[in-house]
């Protein structure tokens, strides 16, 4: 009778443990994948944000105030709302525009009682009485691109940037405009202006960014820092840049004079949603927001982050975070979502 094979016990052990190992592998994969769709961050004990109900399903895109209490909120589908209590409540307004045109009001700015609204397609409005009345300024048909960002600069003065990076300035209430850049930057997905007049833009495909400052004849092109396409860029309070990229990555530029210098990528949370904007509140806390109610804050320069308990309850994508010089703050979201800073 042949001796029993020495390999049989080992084979029996393999058959015994194989289902167990498979189960452990499935569980490990489950937990690993679950980490991509759960928060992984602690939620703050309280929130400085208060939801503000809006009687609209349009997307708020920009907000500006004439004084401490009176202001306007504009957005898609000709949305314009007015507040007289600092943004705690809003009432719908109407603009005298052709009904067949579904304008997207994308930018608004005030300098005292003089206001400007930029919209698409081809819309520019001006008010001299705090927004009670608006007059339309007809733009040159040869204007490169569509109006994208309007900045009020003082009495009868404003600066208009388009979605291809053309920059124009008026000093006579919009009757004439002077080009500030010789060549446009090309199609952009995002464009921001600093308080001292510098611009940063992200290319339409997110594969590079460009900068421009007063006195330069053309935009300066810069390559992105990683394989991840760029989403949004803007300016930190000290004038240096910040960057949001696909894959929920964010970076900070440590030197405002060198847009090629960047810190390491920071990924606060991997919940499957990217970030769409970033801003600094009056206390210096950094806020970033994005898809599916993602609203995070960091009080240590981006090293650690917390989820905001009010933000995560909102069924929306946060697209813009705005803090005014006087301390007012708002988070704008899709489908009529708005949060107001209450400190």
Feature names for model-found ranges:
Residues 19-34:
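Bacterial N-terminal signal peptides
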Residues 34-343:
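Residue-level hotspots at or immediately adjacent to binding/recognition sites across diverse folds
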Residues 4-23:
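Bacterial N-terminal signal peptides that target proteins for export
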């Amino acid at each position: 009778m042949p001796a029993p094979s020495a390999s049989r016990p080992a084979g029996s052990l393999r058959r015994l443990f194989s289902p167990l190992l498979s189960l452990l592998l499935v569980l490990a994969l489950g937990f690993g994948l679950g980490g991509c769709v759960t928060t992984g961050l602690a939620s703050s004990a309280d929130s400085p944000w208060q939801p503000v109900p809006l009687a609209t399903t349009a997307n708020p895109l920009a907000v500006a105030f004439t004084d401490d209490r009176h202001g306007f909120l504009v957005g898609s589908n000709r949305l314009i709302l007015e507040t007289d209590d600092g943004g705690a409540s809003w009432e719908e307004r109407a603009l005298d525009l052709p009904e067949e045109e579904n304008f997207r009001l994308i930018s608004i700015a005030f300098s005292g009682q003089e206001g400007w609204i930029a919209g698409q397609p081809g819309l520019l409005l001006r008010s001299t009485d705090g927004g009670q009345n608006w007059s339309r300024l007809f733009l040159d048909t040869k204007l490169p691109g569509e109006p994208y960002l309007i900045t009020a600069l003082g009495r009868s003065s404003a600066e208009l940037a388009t979605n291809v990076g053309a920059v124009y300035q008026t000093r006579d209430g919009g009757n004439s405009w002077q080009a500030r850049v010789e060549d446009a930057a090309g199609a952009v997905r995002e464009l921001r202006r600093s308080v001292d007049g510098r611009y940063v833009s992200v290319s339409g495909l997110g594969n590079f960014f460009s900068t421009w400052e007063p006195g330069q004849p053309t935009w300066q092109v810069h390559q992105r820092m990683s394989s991840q396409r760029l989403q949004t860029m803007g300016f930190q309070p000290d004038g240096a840049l910040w960057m949001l990229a696909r894959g929920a990555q964010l970076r900070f530029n440590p030197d405002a004079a060198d847009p090629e210098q960047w810190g390491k990528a920071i990924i606060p949370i991997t919940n499957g949603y990217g970030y769409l904007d970033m801003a600094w509140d009056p206390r210096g806390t950094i806020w970033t927001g994005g898809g599916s109610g993602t609203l995070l804050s960091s009080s240590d320069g981006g090293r650690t982050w917390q989820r905001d308990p009010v933000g995560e309850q909102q069924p929306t994508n946060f697209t813009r975070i705005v803090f005014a010089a006087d301390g007012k703050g708002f988070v704008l979201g899709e489908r009529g979502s708005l949060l107001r800073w209450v400190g």
